[in-house]
Amino acid sequence: MTDFALNAEVRSDLGKGASRRLRRNVSMVPAVIYGGDKAPQSISLLAKDLAKLLENEAAFSHVLAVNVAGATENVVIKALQRHPAKGFVLHADFQRVVAGQKLTAHVPLHFINEATAVGVKQQGGEISHTINEVEVSCLPKDLPEFIEVDMAAVEVGQTVHMSDLKLPKGVELVALAHGNDLAVSNIHASRVKAEDEGAAE
């Protein structure tokens, strides 16, 4: 397990104008911590520290320690607002983590055995990913770093759905809980192969 930590300052100058000044003047990112039994807290983070943290995919599915004014808040990343053209973070939302209380977080999918999948190796198909992350609900101690999608037995024309995923103990998919069994990945006939067969006919 990697430790993820950020240092933050309490932000008292609030509002959109203040947020713009913060980003422009000192390379700081405005953020808010909310949830649990405490009031929301406005904070500011060094942009370079946040950018470095986000380089690690696992940061999105780990409990982070945010140090604010001598106290540590355990949080998960809830939402990031990015610049539409340049991609850097404009604002961050963090949700407090309370031991014994379920949280929701976005966890990346790791696709395995793609090259050796039946539909690829034996049938010449191509894999498409419909989604690359899922929202999970679990206790903080059960939060997985990622969820594997095993493509080994998938054939051409078959689709992997959320209900096909093997989840760690204590982890639920939010979409499934709401009755939405979304497609995750599929293997379809190669366009080149389909064109060749069409020409042969």
UniProtKB/Swiss-Prot annotation:
Q: Does the keyword Ribosomal protein apply?
A: yes
Tell me the GO molecular function terms: 5S rRNA binding; structural constituent of ribosome
Per the record, its GO cellular-component terms are: cytosolic large ribosomal subunit
Pfam families listed in its UniProt record: Ribosomal_L25p, Ribosomal_TL5_C
Can you state the subunit structure given in the record? Part of the 50S ribosomal subunit; part of the 5S rRNA/L5/L18/L25 subcomplex. Contacts the 5S rRNA. Binds to the 5S rRNA independently of L5 and L18.
Family label: Belongs to the bacterial ribosomal protein bL25 family. CTC subfamily.
Q: What is this protein called?
A: Large ribosomal subunit protein bL25
Organism, by scientific name, is: Ectopseudomonas mendocina (strain ymp)
Gene expressing this chain: rplY
